[in-house]
Each structure stands twice: as C-alpha cells, then as structure tokens.
A protein has these predicted regions:
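Short Gly/Pro-enriched loop/turn and capping motifs at secondary-structure junctions
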Residues: 158-161, 184-187
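Active-site acidic carboxylates
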Residues: 2-119, 146, 150-151, 172-179, ...
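Short beta-strand immediately N-terminal to the catalytic nucleophile in serine-hydrolase-like folds
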Residues: 155
Length: 214
C-alpha cells in the first residue's frame, strides 16, 4: 500500500494559485460555478508557503480562443487551429479589464510572482508552464528551478483545465505535484472533470485537501 504524501510545505515547495480572476467567478464572462469559494481557503493556507506564484489569464482583444473571432461559431464549439483542437470561449480576461483582475478578496501579499499567460493572440494557454502549442514556455520552470523548488501545490480555477494542465506539465518537467482539491472548482464540460482527474492520477499527481496542509 502506497504511503500518503508528506503534505506540510517546506522550503522546496511552491504554491501555484491558478487564475482566481473575476471572469472565472460568479458574474464573470466565463464563470466557474462557485469559483469564488476557493478564495477564503487559499487565503487561509497560502501563508504556509514561502514560495507563492499567482497566474493570471491575460488575453488581448480578438484572441483566437474567443468564439467571437470565428464567425458562425458559438462559445464551447471546437475548432481546429494550427496547434490542434481548440475549445472556443466567451471573450474573457481581456487585458486591463475588470474581468481580468484578480478577485478582490484574494489576499496573498507575499506572492513573489504574478505570471500572465494567454497573451499571445494566436495561441491559448491553460498551463502555467507551457502554452497550448506545447512548445512556448512561460518561464515558470526556470523560475522555480532557480529557487530550488522540487514540488508544487496547485489550486484555483478551473480544475479540469488550467489547474490540471499546470499539474500535468509540472510532472512532465520533473516536479512533484499535488492538487488541493477543495481549493479548486471545475467547469466540467462533457465529463472533462473526471477525465482530468484520471489523467492526473496516471501522471502521478497527488490529490489532497486543504486540511492536509495545516
């Protein structure tokens, strides 16, 4: 029987808080159901980490992942782009907009890095490590390696997209990865949540609860 992971954060651990932004919370352009419920949890345990990274979806107007950029298409349709299949989204997290801002109640003042992703007009970005073309790096890998980070804890929005892609890429790049399940919320589109958890399990991503951190 496999032993439970050691979940108390140390100096070789980093917390990655993914896309806790207004457009992904109730009332936003691409709201994740109960997405704002992660905020008090993140605020409660983030202080346990010396190393904290916040990510922020940061799209230019007319981004290729927006349904409005594809005449005749509607949100949640899929199209084929140069790098593969792309879900089309409502316009969201447009650079400089209120929707792109981090949730007003998110309070992680000791976060050292806010990493903006999705700013290349023709490529979407779910993962905090790699753009959706699977070639363009965000620089997060090097940032963590320079600080001696060996393990990442991932939370935020949404479980089945940006959280999962971040955790999966962390594993591919050699980091241990844990997802804080109750500090995430999902879109869950056509079984995408169950599929994401299955992929993460196969990749060796650990699934924990916020209470395990304290």
């Amino acid at each position: 029987m496999a032993s439970a992971p050691q979940t108390k954060p140390g100096i070789r651990d980093a917390l990655i808080v993914v896309d806790v932004q207004n457009d992904f919370c109730p009332g936003g352009r691409l709201a994740v159901q109960k997405g704002d419920e992660v905020v008090p949890l993140v605020n409660a345990f983030a202080g346990r980490f010396e190393n904290v990274v916040l990510t922020q979806d940061w799209h230019p107007p007319g981004h290729r992942s927006f349904a409005t950029s594809h005449p005749g298409s509607k949100p949640f349709d899929s199209v084929r782009l140069a790098y593969g299949e792309q879900v089309l989204w409502p316009d969201h997290c447009v650079q400089g907009s209120d929707g792109a801002a981090l949730h007003k109640d998110l309070c992680v003042p000791h976060a050292q890095l806010v990493l903006r992703k999705g700013h290349h007009r023709d490529v979407d970005s779910y993962s905090a490590f790699l753009e959706a073309d699977r070639k363009t790096r965000t620089g997060l890998e090097g940032y963590l390696e320079e600080r001696g980070i060996k393990r990442v804890f991932v939370c935020g929005l949404a479980t089945d997209f940006c959280v999962a892609w971040t955790a999966l890429d962390a594993r591919k790049l050699g980091f241990a990865a844990l997802v804080v399940e109750d500090a995430c919320r999902a879109i869950d589109m056509q079984g995408s949540l169950a599929a994401a958890w299955e992929k993460m399990k196969k990749a060796g991503v650990e699934r924990i609860r916020s209470g395990d951190i304290f």
